[in-house]
C-alpha cells in the first residue's frame, strides 16, 4: 500500500476509535463509513459483497461476545469481517480456542498477520484475505461478526447451509434478520449514550 494511503487509513481508524467513546454505535458506524470511504479502495466500496466499514470493537465487547458464546479450548472460532484481528486474537489468547478470521482488506490482513507472528500464535490463529461469500466456514463451532443487517441477511442462508447443528453465532449490535435470538446482552459504553448489543444464536 502506498505510504500516503497507509497514513490516511491510520488517521481514519484513529478517529473512529476516538469517536467510539462519545458516539452511539449507530453514530460511530456512520462516522466510520464516511471516514473509510475516503481511504478504502474504490473496488471494495463498489463491490456488491462489501459488508461495511471496519469499526474497532472495544476489548470489553470482544470478551463479552466470546463469553456469550461460551468459547473454550475445544472451539474453532470464525470471525466474519475480522478487521485488525482483535476477536480471533482474543479467542486464542484469552479463551484458548483456535480461530480463523476472514477479511478482504489487505492492510488489515497484514496487520493481523503481524500480530499473530508477534504473539506466537501461528499454530492456532490464521487470517484469510478474501470474500466471505467465497469461503467455507463449515469447520466452525462458533461464528462471530460485526456486520450490517443487509450483510447478515445475505449471509444467513449460507451459514444455515454450511454450519453444523449446535454451532453458536454471535452478532454484534444488529440482530440477524429472520433468526430466533437465543440470548441478548447489552453492554454500556464509556459514555452515557454509548451501548453495545450482542445477540446469540444457535444453528438448529
What do these predicted ranges mean?
Residues 98-103:
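Conserved SAM-binding motif I beta-strand of class I
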Residues 150-204:
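C-terminal substrate-binding/active-site "lid" region of AdoMet-derived donor-dependent transferases
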Residues 6-15:
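Bacterial N-terminal signal peptides
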Residues 20-75, 105-139:
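S-adenosyl-L-methionine
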Residues 85-89:
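Glycine-rich SAM-binding Motif I of class I
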Amino acid at each position: 500500500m502506498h505510504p500516503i494511503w497507509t497514513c490516511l487509513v491510520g488517521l481514519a481508524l484513529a478517529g473512529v476509535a476516538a469517536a467510539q467513546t462519545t458516539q452511539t454505535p449507530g453514530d460511530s458506524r456512520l462516522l466510520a463509513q464516511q471516514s473509510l470511504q475516503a481511504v478504502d479502495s474504490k473496488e471494495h466500496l463498489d463491490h456488491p459483497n462489501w459488508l461495511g466499514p471496519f469499526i474497532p470493537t472495544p476489548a470489553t465487547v470482544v470478551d463479552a461476545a466470546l463469553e456469550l458464546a461460551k468459547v473454550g479450548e475445544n472451539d474453532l472460532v470464525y470471525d466474519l469481517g475480522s478487521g485488525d484481528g482483535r476477536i480471533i486474537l482474543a479467542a486464542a489468547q484469552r479463551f484458548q480456542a483456535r480461530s480463523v478470521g476472514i477479511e478482504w482488506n489487505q492492510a488489515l490482513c497484514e496487520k493481523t498477520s503481524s500480530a499473530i507472528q508477534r504473539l506466537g500464535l501461528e499454530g492456532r490463529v490464521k487470517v484469510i484475505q478474501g470474500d466471505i461469500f467465497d469461503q467455507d466456514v463449515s469447520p466452525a463451532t462458533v461464528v462471530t461478526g460485526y456486520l450490517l443487517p443487509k450483510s447478515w441477511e445475505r449471509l444467513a442462508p449460507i451459514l444455515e447451509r454450511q454450519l453444523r447443528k449446535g454451532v453458536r453465532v454471535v452478532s454484534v449490535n444488529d440482530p440477524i434478520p429472520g433468526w430466533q435470538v437465543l440470548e441478548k446482552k447489552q453492554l454500556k459504553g464509556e459514555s452515557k449514550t454509548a451501548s453495545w448489543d450482542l445477540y446469540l444464536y444457535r444453528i438448529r
